[in-house]
């Protein structure tokens, strides 16, 4: 089904792969589509260390307030590139009184003041709008959402934390080394009933755990590309984020051209293909004809098995993934019963998915028992077409509830299942508690990811888990007509029309960032959390869902940091900056520093591999406003989380082995300021126990740029620009 090839390969004329060729690998690397787009946007003058300027940017209502506030504090006067502000995450305004709609009105006032594009709530999810209106072949787009991926439309898109968008707003650059490029060689044609989520889940399952494509660009090539409709490609592409890759790009063809023509932007198309000789650092071959209906079991998109494998041995498969608590979902006939289905967001709410779901459900009923199914078309143009052609009526008639464009089910702000229930979703993630359950209140729920087709098949079977490939359905050939009249009525298009006389509209929850100190000569850090999970997600570092309503108030949001993973973290971090260490610790610190006064004191968390998941900067900024000085890790799950740490003034330390300290211990890093200035990557530190005992600890950092070092010295990105 999927084959990984670690060694590099040459692609000749877009058709033949070979291990060796007469052209050097270094020269042939320039033949990839990714290389051509990256170098076209590079301002550094060399192709090793890139300084990228993007064509457009996008943020949603969890992130844009913080980004604009940071940019304001750093001297923003107008948006220098098209910047789209969508309102698709906290659209329901159900938590915190007025605070969500206050943020939306702040966003509209900012779009008017600085010249932005404002998409009101319920009009579109962020990535649907960007696909429909802003993508273009050869473009690059930066978004403050990890699923910023438009590669199937010829657009290299990257999801990053807010500070990276701030840099673009201030006419600075996105600085990265030239990434490796992995060929995703698609062959064959999907069988009937297989959808984009099936392919995506299979791909994630094959590459995630090994980090095979981590921080690399996925370039989709091969004869199988032409066999996929454009929205099928979009559905695969948006999920590449879950592989931990940096970005993605696809060859373009007549189907890509037709997409742009349908959306009234024929000029956005151009043919993209590798040069006659292109070199890829590794390759993944996906035989589309062998992909089955898939399911990603809780609690990660990489927990991939076929639906029929799970059905054949439910207890064995569930036990393999540590999910024995789901044995209760197995009925007396050995079937797995689920309580909820959801088709939503940038991955699920695509037109083709909903048409296929309607084909399966047409004339059937989902029943009047526990099982419920909700569908969220990803944009008003999609909803408009579904209504015009009668597909919406078919879904409603089967018992499906049809909702507006909203990302809520993807991050815990809508369709939270009942306690102990299993939900199957065509959405992006299924991390622990991301669906909205509160473990502190003894709540738990489970989300498994499936394609819309198998979700509809399950719904048609009364909630009994069913693979769409087991059905004999005559699927409608989707015939989408794009009608953007809703956008023309409601979207504010202000790019190039900045009006400095407009006053920003602040609600009572919108607060400025607190002051953050510059780096001291030495730092003393108290260990406030020690996490030994294989991977720590950003949802665990700062929960999503209703917590996100407080996103515009840094101090209030910080109260929720690690609340579902380590509920005592916040109180420990606060105590660290408010209380002096005991005499034994102070004496040891003074002895090691040779000074009477204590160094700068902060907190630190250790996690083996933190930062998988969301691009939300709050995963780092919440630690910082509580006094966080650093993270210590064996490795960082994503480039974007490491960047968030640096941009908020926290050192991304690495340890070669699991460190021998525990919560309550102190870490003293001597000469840290001089080490950063001198570009040293190795830091001499000490673990100090409460009784004053000490032992040495070696910490490192890797590949910090000069700008990143200066940001650390200044204390955060805001200070860096102020100075």
Label each PLM-derived region with a short phrase.
Residues 1-723:
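Fe-S-dependent hydro-lyases/dehydratases of central metabolism
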């Amino acid at each position: 089904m999927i084959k990984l090839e670690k060694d590099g390969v040459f692609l000749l004329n877009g058709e033949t792969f070979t291990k060796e060729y007469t052209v050097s690998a270094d020269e042939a690397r320039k033949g990839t589509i990714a290389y051509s787009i990256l170098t076209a946007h590079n301002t550094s003058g060399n192709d090793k260390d890139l300084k990228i300027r993007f064509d457009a940017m996008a943020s949603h209502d969890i992130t844009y307030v913080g980004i604009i506030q940071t940019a304001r504090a750093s001297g923003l006067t107008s948006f220098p590139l098209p910047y789209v502000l969508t309102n698709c995450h906290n659209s329901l305004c159900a938590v915190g009184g007025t605070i969500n709609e206050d943020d939306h009105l702040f966003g509209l006032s900012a779009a008017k003041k600085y010249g932005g594009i404002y998409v009101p709530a319920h009009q579109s999810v962020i990535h649907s709008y960007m696909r429909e209106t802003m993508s273009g072949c050869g473009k690059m787009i930066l978004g403050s959402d990890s699923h910023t991926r438009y590669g199937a439309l010829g657009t290299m898109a990257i999801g990053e934390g807010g500070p990276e968008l701030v840099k673009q707003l201030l006419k600075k650059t996105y600085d990265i080394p030239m990434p490796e490029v992995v060929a995703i060689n698609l062959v064959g044609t999907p069988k009937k009933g297989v959808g984009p989520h099936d392919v995506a889940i299979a791909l994630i399952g094959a590459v995630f755990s090994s980090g095979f494509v981590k921080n690399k660009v996925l370039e989709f090539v091969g004869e199988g590309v032409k066999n996929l409709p454009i929205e099928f490609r979009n559905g695969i592409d948006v999920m590449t984020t879950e592989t931990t890759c940096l970005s993605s790009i696809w060859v373009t063809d007549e189907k890509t051209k037709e997409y742009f023509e349908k959306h009234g932007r024929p000029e956005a198309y151009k043919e993209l293909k590798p040069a006659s000789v292109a070199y890829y650092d590794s390759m993944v071959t996906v035989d589309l004809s062998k992909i089955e209906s898939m399911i990603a079991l809780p609690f990660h998109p990489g927990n991939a098995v076929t639906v029929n494998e799970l059905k054949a041995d439910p207890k064995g498969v569930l036990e393999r993934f540590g999910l024995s608590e789901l044995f209760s979902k197995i009925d007396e006939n050995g079937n797995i019963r689920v309580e909820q289905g959801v088709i939503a967001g940038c991955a699920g709410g695509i037109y083709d998915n909903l048409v296929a779901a309607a084909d399966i459900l047409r004339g059937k009923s989902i029943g009047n028992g526990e099982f419920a199914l909700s569908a969220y078309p990803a944009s008003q143009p999609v909803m408009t077409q579904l209504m015009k052609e009668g597909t919406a009526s078919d879904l409603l008639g089967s018992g499906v509830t049809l909702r507006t464009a909203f990302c809520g089910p993807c991050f815990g702000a809508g369709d939270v299942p009942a306690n102990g229930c299993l939900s199957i979703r065509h959405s992006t993630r299924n991390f622990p508690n991301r669906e909205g359950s509160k473990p502190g209140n003894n709540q738990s729920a489970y989300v498994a990811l499936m394609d819309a087709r198998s979700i509809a098949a399950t719904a048609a079977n009364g909630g009994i888990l069913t693979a769409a490939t087991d059905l004999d359905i005559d699927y409608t050939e989707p015939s989408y007509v794009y009608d953007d009249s809703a956008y023309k009525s409601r979207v504010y298009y202000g790019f190039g029309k900045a009006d400095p006389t407009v006053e920003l509209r602040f609600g009572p929850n919108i607060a400025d960032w607190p002051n953050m100190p510059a780096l001291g000569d030495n730092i003393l850090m108290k260990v406030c959390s020690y996490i030994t999970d294989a991977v720590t997600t950003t949802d665990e570092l700062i929960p999503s869902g209703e917590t996100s309503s407080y996103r515009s108030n840094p101090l209030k949001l910080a109260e929720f940091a690690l609340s579902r993973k380590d509920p005592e973290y916040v109180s420990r971090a606060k105590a660290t900056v408010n209380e002096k260490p005991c005499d034994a610790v102070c004496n040891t610190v003074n002895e090691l520093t040779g000074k009477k006064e204590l160094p700068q004191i902060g907190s630190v968390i250790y996690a083996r591999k933190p930062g998988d998941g969301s691009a939300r900067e709050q995963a780092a900024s919440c630690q910082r406003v509580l006094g966080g000085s650093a993270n210590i890790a064996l490795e960082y799950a994503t480039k974007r989380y490491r960047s968030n740490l640096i941009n908020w003034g926290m050192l991304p330390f690495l340890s070669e082995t699991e460190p021998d300290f525990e919560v309550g211990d102190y870490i003293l890093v001597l000469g840290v300021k001089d080490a950063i200035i001198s570009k040293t990557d190795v830091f001499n530190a000490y673990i100090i126990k409460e009784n004053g005992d000490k032992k040495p600890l070696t910490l490192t950092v890797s590949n910090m740029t000069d700008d990143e070092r200066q940001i650390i010295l200044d204390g955060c990105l805001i200070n860096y620009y102020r100075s």
